[in-house]
Amino acid sequence: MDIVGIAWAALMVVFTFSLSLVVWGRSGL
């Protein structure tokens, strides 16, 4: 595994997690 691939995967995880928090927050959960 190269460092760029790991960094890109980590970025996608953080982005997906933050987006989920925004959606849940607007849903009132």
Swiss-Prot record:
It is a single-pass membrane protein. The keyword DNA-binding does not apply. The keyword Nuclease does not apply. InterPro entries: Cytochr_b6-f_cplx_su8_sf (IPR036143), Cytochrome_b6-f_cplx_su8 (IPR005497). GO terms for biological process: cytochrome complex assembly; photosynthesis. GO terms for cellular component: chloroplast thylakoid membrane; cytochrome b6f complex. Keywords: Chloroplast, Electron transport, Membrane, Photosynthesis, Plastid, Thylakoid, Transmembrane, Transmembrane helix, Transport. GO terms for molecular function: electron transporter, transferring electrons within cytochrome b6/f complex of photosystem II activity. It comes from the Eukaryota. Its main location: plastid. Pfam families: PetN (PF03742). It is found in: Plastid, Chloroplast thylakoid membrane. SUPFAM superfamilies: PetN subunit of the cytochrome b6f complex. The chain crosses the membrane at residues 3-23. Component of the cytochrome b6-f complex, which mediates electron transfer between photosystem II (PSII) and photosystem I (PSI), cyclic electron flow around PSI, and state transitions. Belongs to the PetN family. The 4 large subunits of the cytochrome b6-f complex are cytochrome b6, subunit IV (17 kDa polypeptide, PetD), cytochrome f and the Rieske protein, while the 4 small subunits are PetG, PetL, PetM and PetN. The complex functions as a dimer. HAMAP family: Cytb6_f_PetN (MF_00395). This is Cytochrome b6-f complex subunit 8. It comes from Cryptomeria japonica. The lineage of its organism: Eukaryota, Viridiplantae, Streptophyta, Embryophyta, Tracheophyta. The gene is petN.
